[in-house]
Amino acid sequence: MAKISFNDISFTYEGSEAETIKGFQLAIEDGEILSLLGKSGSGKTTLLKIMAGLLSPQKGRLCFDNEDVTQLTAKKRDIAQVFQFPVLYDSMNVEDNVKFPLRIKKLPEIEVLKRFERVCSLLELDPILKSKSKDLSLYQRQIVSIARAFVRPNLKAVFLDEPLTALSPKLKWQLRKKIKTLQREDRVTMVFVTHDQTEALSFADRVGIIDAGTLVQLDEPKTIYERPLTTFVGDFIGNPGMNFLPVEAFFSKHDSRKKASKVGFRAEWAELAEVGEGRLSGKVVGFEADRTRDHQPYGTTYIHSNFGQMRVRGAYQRLVGKTVSVRLTSHLFFDSNDTLINEDG
């Protein structure tokens, strides 16, 4: 286990004039699961490679437990990596693949067997131990690569780069559960890179939102969702993202809330009402169902108002083309810099 600290780290790829990572500061707690979440090209995989020793920053220090490891090679960092597409030895069977990291450490056979049996039991690998890696499904190959990661002795951290992307939703859920069981057993520090919000918010102890090589918010998943620090985070997180309307949609120009520029609210913080029963109003222009609830279509109603489009979550109602009011149960204020301010504006 290790506490991992980024201290003012910057990185630029050769041939590029723009910094990919810019003065990055982050402390990852010993034994926690941290998800780095961001759009493609935001810099999250670059950060993972810096932690793993695959890239060296031009500026700053990376520390494991206050020890500067910035210039240490990957082999000397006592870490393991799991990638989107598993890297296995196809000529070996599953048992030999899992034992390989232990054999190259020249551990006593009794120690090899002990660690091997433990990880195989937790990941339920027994039925495929004698199978050749080349004959496995993608899901099975990924489980084996995870076993290879966690079987290592003196493991300080595990880094996962989009390990579930190519799997079906059901298999993703199964594999997330297995990974979390292993991590909780070992209390190993884990960093999980993804662009999938569901993975990040359901899997991690904390989530770091990365945008253009900077950390824009670091919080527990519930806080990330309910109190985004910027309109970028509010829009990026959630399906659909947060609604944003100018503050004038709610209050007169002479209202005391002069600092507020925008009002933000989640689609589930709003409900449809009869005209005149809500502060907002607009014309229903569409409905998109994504599930059923109580045998009724449930999804997002799209409403066009004079101040912009609104999205409201709820059961289907035959309202397309009609004017409705929207009533809010909660909302947030943002300033002219798109930054969250207090509820009083």
Show which residues each predicted segment covers:
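Helix-to-loop junction immediately C-terminal to a conserved catalytic motif
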Residues: A52
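Conserved Walker
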Residues: T45-T46
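Conserved ABC transporter NBD signature motif
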Residues: G60-D68
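Conserved beta-strand
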Residues: F6-I9, E17-E29, G60
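ABC ATPase nucleotide-binding domains
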Residues: D78, L88-L229
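The feature captures the beta-strand-to-loop junction immediately N-terminal to the Walker
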Residues: L37-K39
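Conserved coupling/switch loops of ABC nucleotide-binding domains, chiefly the family-specific signature
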Residues: Q58-R61, A212
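Non-catalytic connector elements of ABC transporters
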Residues: K253-G345
